[in-house]
Amino acid sequence: MGTRLLPALFLVLLVLGFEVQGTQQPQQDEMPSPTFLTQVKESLSSYWESAKTAAQNLYEKTYLPAVDEKLRDLYSKSTAAMSTYTGIFTDQVLSVLKGEE
């Protein structure tokens, strides 16, 4: 796999994984209407549901607790680093805007 394809694939699988793990909301029953827009909406909804099901099956098949723990650790370390660098950047911007006293 190319280096460009790997992050894109990772992000798509991550988004689908979060969608699969999200809470299920009950769908409201609507009156069937034969309009074109409703048919398109139902078609897109069925495609989305099949993609979610496929992603859930793939996630369940390839779930590795060690990888999950590493990803959680990587996320916590990267957010800690980003908050540190954001604080430094904010201090620098404020000192530039405030000027010398």
Swiss-Prot record:
The entry's localization annotation reads: Secreted
Q: What span is annotated as the signal peptide, if there is one?
A: 1-22
A biological-process GO annotation: negative regulation of very-low-density lipoprotein particle clearance
**One of the record's GO molecular function terms:** lipoprotein lipase activator activity
Source domain of life is Eukaryota
Where is region (Lipid binding) located? 66-74
Where does this protein chiefly localize? secreted
Could you tell me which residues belong to the region O-glycosylated at one site?
23-38
Consequence recorded when altering residue 48 to R: In HLPP1B; variant Wakayama
* A Pfam family this chain is assigned to: Apo-CII
Ranges for region Lipoprotein lipase cofactor = 78-101
GO cellular component, alphabetical, reads: chylomicron; early endosome; extracellular region; extracellular space; intermediate-density lipoprotein particle; low-density lipoprotein particle; spherical high-density lipoprotein particle; very-low-density lipoprotein particle
What is the disease in the record? Hyperlipoproteinemia 1B: Autosomal recessive trait characterized by hypertriglyceridemia, xanthomas, and increased risk of pancreatitis and early atherosclerosis.
Record's function text: Component of chylomicrons, very low-density lipoproteins (VLDL), low-density lipoproteins (LDL), and high-density lipoproteins (HDL) in plasma. Plays an important role in lipoprotein metabolism as an activator of lipoprotein lipase. Both proapolipoprotein C-II and apolipoprotein C-II can activate lipoprotein lipase. In normolipidemic individuals, it is mainly distributed in the HDL, whereas in hypertriglyceridemic individuals, predominantly found in the VLDL and LDL.
Its family?
A: Belongs to the apolipoprotein C2 family.
Q: What is this protein called?
A: Apolipoprotein C-II
Species annotation: Homo sapiens
